[in-house]
């Protein structure tokens, strides 16, 4: 899905999330002939040919299953300040348009029983039924969370996870990506994964994931050549690895592994958050 005209996006701010929401909404409105919205970055690369990707995901289309990772978010630093994302309203690109401004403290939920914020990755695979739920927001929950996350730092890593859990949508806690994260050192962790190289490309191929990231135009040249050759060959084991990775999703019960909804949670409370 290509959005025209192009829109300004500020890294870490709500315009990243909004662009994805607009994209899936346009898909819902424009065609009935699809089952999954797959959010990819320019540094992603498929590990299966398109026909095999379609076959694997097609096994779960009738169940309405989305593939999303997430955990309850405990970091308060993402919600302690209100973020003014200038990409939302500037008509022209400027030096300041990519900068966010801290303009005060937002109003947080009055109690933890109101709702739980979840954190995962932006790179999700969403079933059409869930995309339709976000686009229409029939109970106003998805729309209310859009308002909440518009002032949330790095909302793209939380919006879909949070809405999916509170909408009780079928899901499996795996976004089906291979990502090579650098080792975590004491008191420090990297925000970006290591590039895929010749050293770890075979690990990516054997992982059963549908996509790998991230690929660097220079560092990943060797890995890219290996993958391109691999995809051109008939390999029955390749499809089998992906099928085996997704096998636990057959029970459609994976959401309980990361959706810890408060016992006293009420959709009505979420609707009234901003009243």
Describe every region a protein language model picked out:
Residues 1-275:
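ER/Golgi luminal nucleotide-sugar-dependent glycosyltransferases, focusing on the catalytic module
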């Amino acid at each position: 899905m290509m959005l025209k005209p192009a829109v300004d996006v500020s890294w870490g701010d709500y315009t990243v999330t909004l662009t994805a929401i607009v994209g899936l909404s346009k898909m819902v409105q424009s065609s009935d002939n699809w089952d999954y919205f797959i959010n990819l970055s320019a540094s992603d690369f498929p590990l299966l040919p398109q026909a095999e990707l379609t076959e694997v995901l097609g096994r779960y289309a009738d169940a309405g299953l989305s593939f999303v990772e997430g955990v309850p978010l405990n970091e308060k630093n993402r919600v302690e300040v209100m973020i003014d994302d200038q990409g939302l309203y500037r008509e022209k690109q400027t030096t300041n348009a990519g900068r966010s401004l801290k303009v005060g403290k937002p109003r947080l939920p009055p109690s933890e029983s109101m709702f739980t914020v979840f954190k995962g990755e932006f790179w999700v695979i969403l079933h059409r039924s869930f995309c339709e739920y976000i686009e229409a927001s029939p109970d106003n929950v998805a729309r209310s969370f859009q308002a909440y996350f518009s002032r949330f730092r790095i909302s793209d890593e939380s919006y879909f996870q949070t809405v999916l859990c509170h909408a009780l949508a079928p899901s499996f806690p795996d976004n089906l990506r291979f990502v090579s994260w650098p080792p975590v050192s004491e008191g420090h962790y990297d925000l970006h994964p290591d590039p895929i190289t010749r050293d770890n490309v075979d690990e990516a191929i054997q992982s059963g994931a549908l996509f790998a990231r991230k690929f660097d135009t220079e560092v990943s040249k060797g890995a890219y050549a290996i993958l391109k050759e691999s995809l051109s060959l008939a390999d029955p084991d390749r499809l089998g690895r992906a099928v085996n990775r997704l096998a636990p999703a057959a029970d459609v019960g994976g959401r309980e592994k990361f959706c810890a909804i408060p016992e006293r949670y009420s959709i009505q409370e979420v609707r009234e958050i901003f009243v």
